[in-house]
Swiss-Prot record:
Biological-process GO terms, alphabetical: protein complex oligomerization
Coiled-coil intervals: none
Keywords from the named record: Allergen
Record-given protein name: Mite allergen Der p 5
Quaternary structure annotation from Swiss-Prot or TrEMBL: Monomer. Trimer of homodimers. Oligomerizes in a concentration-dependent manner.
Similarity field: Belongs to the mite group 5 allergen family.
Superkingdom of origin organism: Eukaryota
Biotechnological and industrial applications of this entry: Non-allergenic peptides identified from the mapped major conformational IgE epitope-containing areas could be used for the engineering of house dust mite allergy vaccine.
Pfam family, one: Blo-t-5
GO molecular function, one term: protein homodimerization activity
Location of the region described as Immunodominant conformational IgE-binding epitope in the Swiss-Prot/TrEMBL record: 25-53, 102-132
InterPro entries associated with the record: Mite_allergen_group-5/21 (IPR020306), Mite_allergen_group-5/21_sf (IPR038455)
Length: 132
């Protein structure tokens, strides 16, 4: 889980660096605002994942039915959000005005989401196996 978060942060760092000068047209301004919003959501997501990991650690020490249900529900919500983001990324990747750097960022974000979803599903299965 820590590796995924570190990878996600590294991807975020790559996304923020661009060698091109800023153009001042509406599409680039929209892209800039979109990237700012994505960065905010990634930070919130990272904090949520840290909190979820703390909950799982606490659950392993003292398992309760309520905690198990809450953790599984949170994981299902995160997985659903990743699925929703995947659709947005697919639509953005179809744009013809993307440069190679933007395409790379979108592909990395999509791959990161796929990895995160896979790991969350594994963790969810592990949590479900713990007897209460």
């Amino acid at each position: 889980m820590k590796f995924i978060i570190a990878f996600f942060v590294a991807t975020l760092a790559v996304m923020t660096v661009s060698g091109e000068d800023k153009k001042h047209d509406y599409q680039n301004e929209f892209d800039f605002l979109l990237m700012e919003r994505i960065h905010e959501q990634i930070k919130k997501g990272e904090l949520a994942l840290f909190y979820l990991q703390e909950q799982i650690n606490h659950f392993e020490e003292k398992p309760t039915k309520e905690m198990k249900d809450k953790i599984v529900a949170e994981m299902d919500t995160i997985i659903a959000m990743i699925d929703g983001v995947r659709g947005v990324l697919d639509r953005l990747m179809q744009r013809k005005d993307l440069d190679i750097f933007e395409q790379y960022n979108l592909e990395m974000a999509k791959k990161s989401g796929d990895i995160l979803e896979r790991d969350l599903k594994k963790e969810e299965a592990r949590v479900k196996k713990i007897e209460v």
